[in-house]
Amino acid sequence: MADCLTPENLAAEHLSIARTAQEFWTAEVVPHLAAIQRQDPGVLLGVLRKSADLGFTGISIPERFGGMELDLASVMIVEECFARDASYLVTHGAQAGIGALPLIYFGSEEQKCKYLPQLANASMIAAYALTEPQAGTDAMAIRTRADLTPDGKHYILNGQKMWITNGGLADLYTVFAKVDGEKFTAFLVERAYPGVTPGAEEHKMGLHGSSTTALYLDNVAVPVENVLGEVGRGHIIAFNALNIGRLKIGPYAVGASKEVLALSLAYAKERKAFGTTISEFGAIQHKLAEMAVRIFAVESLYWRVVGQIQQASAIKDLAQECSMVKVYASEAVGYVVDEGVQIHGGYGYHQDYAVERFYRDARIFRIFEGTNEINRVLISRDQEVGTALADIAIQTFALESAELRAQKLGPHAQDMCALIRHQAEERIESATREIHAARGSEPPVRPPAAPVDTIALRRKIARRLLDAGRYVV
């Protein structure tokens, strides 16, 4: 197996970015978290624009347009730091990620000169408008139309978008429409254009602090100069953005899970029951260890893919790997937040405790960027037994990533890897039986695996976590 990127072998400049992001988070975001959740007017935008002063909103934008032009690893570091509040994370991501990347990759020189400096300094807020009421993961089913005017100077857009992050804040939307009802095309649409109307704020289960609205387009005249890329080639832009979005669920899952684990460790060490702290209970140690193991696996998986993308310089060649990260990471963080609430007991169900917010926020990530069900189909390309085949591929890739990383680290990483291996083998075996049952064949007979004392491994991992009070490898 080839060498791969891990968080332990990041460069000095990456560690510097991590420190800067952490300092910004502590000084500028944490004091405003409650106000962000309440959507107090101006607070979220104010924090976002302060992040622009440090270059975070222009992290991927070329320097000549006022950005930092940092590599993908740097972007992931910032995403992981900001993941401690998903509302702020998705707001920042819509600005610095899917709001800017299509323009960076596919924009004309004139478009870049006009818009990128304003996106970099956050004087202009960006949003990405693809989803429609009848077209979610099936993006090619959109109905928004774009018709060229007789003089050839404008496209007239008509349609409705929904679930638009930053929808109520944005000044510039990347809108997808079908030219003549057929040619899937991207447009740069300014909010100031007549006929552009954001809808009311949606009332969501989670992400309470972020702006999510519909977008209505009523005879909107968009200059032909604002076609992004080529007419009929908008799917390339959309799918590249989806791949990046799927990959970014990796750092979200790790950042959120680390915070929930730290909160759970602190609570378990303080909460007493039957004369002792609940951290001494085997059932609680089991949960804490499993939370850490999932963090290690997701961390190993997504950093490996980041390294592969940086070496390949093209994300389109790693679309399946991005889908694997999306599925594995979103399901891992779902487990972690659920166990975090369980460790907190009744307090975990109360809004005064942060784990309640993490629990609500995490649920969307199995739906974002294409549902996990559709991503499994994309991984396997086999409709009949696609889910089982995808699960085998995901578990194998995650296990291999963890093993590659553990080879570079000490015995504690080996312990976590042993648990990952044990669980992956069980899931692969179950998926294999499902495939053979569906096809009416007998699964191969394999010799029994060597027994693994998973209870002892979990106790050992949990004790190390409790001693440190946080996630450690």
Language model: regions and residue ranges:
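Short glycine/proline-enriched turns and hinge-like loops at secondary-structure junctions
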Residues: 70, 138-140, 166-170, 208-210, ...
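A short, Trp-centered hydrophobic/proline-enriched beta-strand micro-motif
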Residues: 122-130
